[in-house]
Amino acid sequence: MTPDPPIRLRRYAPPDEAPTIELWRRSWQQTYPSIDFSARVAWWQERWRQELLASATVTVAEGAEGIVGFVTVDTATGYLDQIVVAPESWGRGIAEALLAEARRQSPRGLDLHVNIDNHRAIRFYQKHGFCTVGDELNPISGRPVHRMSWRP
């Protein structure tokens, strides 16, 4: 599936911080409406700066309306921490484009955790060749998660 209107993938740059953090909030709020993600923005911003930017390659998807998605991949370990797409852009092929970029960056394989009740994400990953390899609890949220893995 190709996104339309066209998007451009590019490396994250420091001026992208505010729009990517807001995109994270909006996307997760849509996925879990009963959780107040506005109250978690400061935590996410700290994690973004201290953990993800320090260890991951971040690629943003940009359309005419601005940043519409991003993916974070630790290329040393193949860990995919986040694929986030603007809710109004779901179904446009942006997640597929970001996943293809993640695979290009980590050709030996990708590993991730996904909330067990995030059925939309689980279907997406399964459709794209990921298998569940275990279950555990997220150490921060305490939510049950699947460990999923993709190998070429």
At which residue positions do the language-model features occur?
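Conserved N-terminal entry element of GNAT/NAT acetyltransferase domains
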Residues: M1-P15, W150
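Acetyl-CoA-dependent GNAT
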Residues: R11-E88, L99-E101, Q105
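Short hydrophobic/aromatic beta-strand or adjacent loop that forms the aromatic wall/cage
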Residues: A56, R143-M148
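Conserved active-site alpha-helix within GNAT-family acetyltransferase domains
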Residues: R92, E96-A97, D117-G134, I140-P144
